[in-house]
């Protein structure tokens, strides 16, 4: 930080805490007592987490300044299936020790309430830290991160054919026994059947398959979140407010404006939902009639699609056991 910024930051957070009783912040210092990382969450973020904490996404892809420091954010879906922010931090680096501090601080802020599922990048330090701090929580690897990492690690081999094969493994392979066959097909079609050990990134990706392939992910509650759509949309939103040449003081000012804009958009959606009648294509279904008035249009549309899909299946009784088959 430039001279004087540390003092300004601490003053900023002290004023926030005085004006907002529920405002929570913590500062990590290094060996010489300099500020290293900063976490904060206001009362509304804490309330939103208490409401929408089942599935969250952790993102560090947005870089806040010319020193390439990451803005870390916990995000989730609100009742309109739009991004909602639960807490943020400016991190000095992306080591396991820094992630440990951030996750412990976040949970302390949220009364140690853990989510059911957390989506993250496949960085080794992050995987280690999440496994350590979020014990008992399913951690999925975001497919968007996988695609970005594939481009960095595989170069020209990460072409359209490869991404078609990877997308199939992520979303369409629903049986663990089928995974190896489809993986071998990808290696044959895209890598000329070369051993997986020739590609370090593929070794790591295969090792962590239970965190990203539908064959395993289907057993966990994900609220329909398989990619980093939350992170992508929030990063695009951030770029409209934050620039790399902003000073730390200007950053916090613009960040607060951005958060308020997100909340204004949510209030607008709440107003429209209260004034709009949600369309139900199954008026004779007791199930659909019972939920149509309880959900926002966006959430009901998600349920509606799942209900549509249910008609693709039937059951047959076979030797006393029930099993499902698709038409």
Predicted regions: what is each one?
Residues 81-85, 145:
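Short Cys/His-based metal-binding microdomains
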Residues 115-125, 145:
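Acidic/histidine-rich, metal-coordinating catalytic segments
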Residues 48, 66, 70-82, 90-91:
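Short conserved beta-strand segments at catalytic cores or DNA/RNA-binding microdomains
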Residues 25, 39-42, 52-63:
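Two-metal-ion RNase H-like nuclease active-site motif
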Residues 54-55, 82, 115-117, 138-141:
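Beta-sheet entry/capping signal
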Residues 99, 125-128:
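Short, well-ordered alpha-helical microsegments
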Residues 65-67, 88-111:
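Active-site beta-loop-alpha junctions of metal-dependent nucleic acid enzymes
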Residues 1-40, 44-47, 131-140, 147-327:
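Hydrophobic, aromatic-enriched, well-ordered structural segments
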């Amino acid at each position: 930080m430039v001279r004087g910024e540390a003092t300004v930051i601490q003053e900023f957070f002290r004023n926030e805490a005085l004006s907002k009783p529920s405002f929570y912040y913590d500062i990590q210092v290094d060996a010489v007592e300099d500020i290293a990382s900063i976490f904060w969450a206001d009362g509304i973020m804490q309330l939103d987490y208490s409401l929408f904490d089942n599935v969250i996404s952790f993102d560090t892809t947005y870089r806040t300044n010319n020193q390439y420091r990451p803005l870390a954010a916990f995000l989730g879906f609100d009742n309109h299936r739009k991004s909602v922010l639960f807490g943020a931090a400016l991190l000095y680096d992306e080591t396991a020790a820094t992630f440990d501090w951030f996750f412990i601080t976040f949970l302390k802020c949220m009364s140690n309430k853990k989510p059911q599922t957390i989506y993250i990048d496949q960085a080794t330090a992050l995987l280690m830290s999440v496994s350590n701090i979020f014990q008992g929580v399913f951690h999925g690897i975001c497919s968007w991160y996988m695609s970005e990492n594939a481009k960095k690690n595989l170069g020209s081999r990460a072409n359209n054919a490869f991404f078609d094969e990877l997308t199939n493994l992520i979303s369409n392979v629903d049986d663990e026994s089928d995974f190896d066959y489809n993986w071998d097909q990808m290696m044959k079609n895209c890598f000329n059947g070369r051993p997986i050990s020739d590609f370090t990134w593929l070794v790591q990706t295969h090792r962590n398959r239970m965190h990203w392939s539908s064959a395993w992910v289907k057993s966990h509650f994900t609220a329909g979140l398989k990619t980093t759509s939350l992170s992508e949309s929030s990063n695009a939103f951030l770029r409209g407010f934050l620039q790399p040449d902003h000073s730390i003081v200007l950053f916090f000012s613009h960040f607060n404006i951005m958060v308020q804009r997100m909340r204004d958009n949510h209030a607008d959606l709440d107003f429209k939902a209260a004034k709009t009648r949600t369309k139900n294509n199954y008026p004779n279904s007791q199930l659909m009639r019972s939920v149509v008035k309880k959900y926002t249009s966006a959430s009901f549309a998600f349920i509606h699609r799942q209900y549509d899909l249910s008609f693709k299946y039937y059951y047959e009784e076979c030797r006393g056991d029930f099993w499902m088959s698709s038409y």
